[in-house]
Curated annotation (Swiss-Prot):
Name of protein: Cyclic AMP-dependent transcription factor ATF-5
Record-listed Phosphoserine modification sites: S256
Outcome following mutation: S126A: Not phosphorylated
Required for protein stabilization induced by IL1B: annotated segments: 1-21
Family classification: Belongs to the bZIP family.
Skewed-composition ranges (Pro residues): 120-140, 178-194
N6-acetyllysine PTM positions: K29
Location of the region described as Leucine-zipper in the Swiss-Prot/TrEMBL record: 236-250
Region (Basic motif): 210-230
Compositionally biased spans, kind Low complexity: 141-150
Length: 282
């Protein structure tokens, strides 16, 4: 057996399990290969009708009876006895390394599963914050600027100016005559008050309004309290009157029942006396 065949057999036995080596060919029991022949010798024997390699004569030509040749396949069959039908080969034992790796992998999977099961659930995502409500539009108030009337100078006619000028000239010519006083100008009119109220009330008025509003609220609360108490008193009084009437009715019934019981007692006493007299007379 050649070295390559031996190495191939050892490699197959190392890679495959022991139960699966039955189909391998035992290279040690194969018949040895015949010695190589020269090509001319094989061809010449075939052409001349001579003997083939085994030395046996052929019935016909050298290429027609090879299908009828019997071959012994016992050397190629496995040495182990064949398994009965319906039975499966026993599984090969797994190596300890694979078992250790499988157990480690199983432990790791169990640890990961426990970790994911013990982990606290994630909180639900918080809803996005609502957008702020739109601000109401500011009321557009027509801002009217207060109008101020400028004082107009008094209108003097040209005749008045000429008269004043002539008087001044005449007064300067006459000695001892005091000059005329200048014409009195009317006082400037006071600026008109703005017709529109200020946008913000005065703080003093706001304080007074708050006090008045609180006073009104206290009055209304006291009035509601008195009304509620009056209604409760009326309800209690009506209930008391109803209970008193019921009490009187029950008392009258009890008195009537008591009179009936006394009447029955008197009847029983009379009956007993009558029977006793009859028994005595008999």
């Amino acid at each position: 057996m050649s070295l390559l065949a031996t190495l191939g057999l050892e490699l197959d036995r190392a890679l495959l399990p022991a139960s699966g080596l039955g189909w391998l060919v035992d290279y040690g029991k194969l018949p040895p290969a015949p010695a190589p022949l020269a090509p001319y010798e094989v061809l010449g024997g075939a052409l001349e009708g001579g003997l083939p390699v085994g030395g046996e004569p052929l019935a016909g030509d050298g290429f027609s009876d090879w299908m009828t040749e019997r071959v012994d396949f016992t050397a190629l069959l496995p040495l182990e006895p064949p398994l009965p039908p319906g039975t499966l080969p026993q599984p090969s034992p797994t190596p300890p390394d694979l078992e250790a790796m499988a157990s480690l992998l199983k432990k790791e999977l169990e640890q990961m599963e426990d970790f994911f099961l013990d982990a606290p659930p994630l909180p639900p995502p918080s809803p996005p914050p609502l957008p702020p409500p739109p601000l109401p539009p500011a009321p557009s108030l027509p801002l009217s600027l207060p109008s101020f009337d400028l004082p107009q100078p008094p209108v003097l006619d040209t005749l008045d100016l000429l008269a004043i000028y002539c008087r001044n000239e005449a007064g300067q010519e006459e000695v001892g005559m005091p000059p005329l006083p200048p014409p009195q100008q009317p006082p400037p009119p006071s600026p008109p008050q703005p017709s529109r109220l200020a946008p913000y009330p005065h703080p003093a008025t706001t304080r007074g309004d708050r006090k008045q509003k609180k006073r009104d609220q206290n009055k209304s609360a006291a009035l509601r309290y008195r009304q509620r108490k009056r209604a409760e008193g009326e309800a209690l009084e009506g209930e008391c009157q109803g209970l008193e009437a019921r009490n009187r009715e029950l008392k009258e019934r009890a008195e009537s029942v008591e009179r009936e019981i006394q009447y029955v007692k008197d009847l029983l006493i009379e009956v007993y006396k009558a029977r006793s007299q009859r028994t005595r007379s008999c």
